[in-house]
UniProtKB/Swiss-Prot annotation:
Zn finger region (SGF11-type): 106-127
Name this polypeptide is given: SAGA-associated factor 11 homolog
GO biological process: chromatin organization; mRNA export from nucleus; positive regulation of DNA-templated transcription; protein transport; regulation of transcription by RNA polymerase II
Lineage: Eukaryota, Metazoa, Ecdysozoa, Arthropoda, Hexapoda
Region annotated Disordered, chain positions: 1-22, 144-196
Gene: Sgf11
Amino acid sequence: MSAANMPTTTGAQGSGNQVPTTSTTIVNHFRELIKDPKNLDEASNYLFQTLLDDAVVGIFNETHHLRKSGNLAALDGVPEDSTYRMCEMPNLDIFGISTAKKPMDCTCPNCDRLVAAARFAPHLEKCMGMGRISSRIASRRLATKEGATSAHLHSAGNTGGTDDEDDVDWSSDKRRKKSNQNSRNNGSKKNNGKSF
């Protein structure tokens, strides 16, 4: 038997009618050829040729499938970056990022002024009237308005009264207690002038 007459895998012959050769059929055919010592050279050539054909056809089929599905670039994998380049320009670090400090300015949405980033929150609070001082002023305004409206109601002869007027004023007791404690000390220190 010559190498041309040896059965090969379906991929090697190119016909789609044959059943694909499995490894067990290859091994069985190889054992038949080895039984006769004269055919040993033929058997080794047959085994080598079928294994080589199988490998080549497998790679060809995989590459063809990747090309048709548009994934051939995935076969190469992710390209590696070029060797680590260091940037040696002034005011840049080794990665090419600027090392100079940039002044961060923010624009106030209320008054459209440029404000330093560190001062933006306090500025915005004051600009929008949300600060502590603005809060106190607003509380005073409300208190004076309420005082004016309640005086207006009393002067109009409203005898029904409101719920607030009927309630006991609990905060006045606290004020009275504070003033009593302050008068007991008569301005002296807590330790009554004793030094340790």
